[in-house]
Amino acid sequence: FKAIPPTVLIFNVSYKCDSKCVMCNSWKLPYHDGLTTEEYRRAFGSRLFRRIEYVGITGAEPTLQKEMVELVHIMADHMAGLRKMTLNTNGFVKERVVRTLESIVDVANERGFVFGTRVSLDGVGDAHEDIRRVWHAFERAMDTVRAMRELQKKKFFNFGVSFTFTAQNMEEGDRIYELCKKEDLNVVFSIARYSELAFGNMD
C-alpha cells in the first residue's frame, strides 16, 4: 500500500459572514482569524500540498478574509501543478468583492492557472432576500454580477452564478434558470449540504 498525495484542496478560509442564511448557521459560529499568513505559508510548504491541482475556496464569505489575495499567492508559490481555482461569493458588497476577485484573476493569469468565480443566488427578488436575510440581497448580488461581467470583457476568468436547492427555495430553481437564460449567464445547480462542523446547520 502506498499513500497517494492529494490533488484537490477544499479550503475554508473563514467562518466570518455578512449573510444570515436560513440554511446555514456559520455566521453564528465563533469567529477567529485562524492562522497568520506566515503560518499558512509554512503549512502550504508541506509536501502534502505539492501535487494539488485544484483548489476550491469556500467558507462563509471568502472575500471577508483580508489576506485572501495573499493566500492565493502563497498557494501558487507552493503548488507547482495548480491548474484551477474557484471561489463562490454572496456578492453583497460589490466594491470589496470585485476588488478582491480582480486581484485573484490577475494572480491566476500571471501564474498560469484558471480562476472561476460565481455569485450565489437562492432565488429571484424577495425569495433570495428571505433566505439570505439581508436587505436588498438580490439587487446587491446582481450589481456584482453585472460588474464581474464587465470585468470579463477586460480579463480572462470563468464566471457565472450558483443556485443551491434547500427546503426553503424548491420553487425558485426554474426562476433562476429563466433569469440566467435571459441574462446569458452560466449557472450551476447543487443540493444543500448539512454539517454541524462546517455550517452548524444540522438543526
Say what each PLM segment does.
Residues 1-115, 196-197:
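Conserved alpha-helical substructure of the radical SAM core
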Residues 109-203:
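Radical SAM enzyme [4Fe-4S]-AdoMet core and its adjacent flexible, acidic
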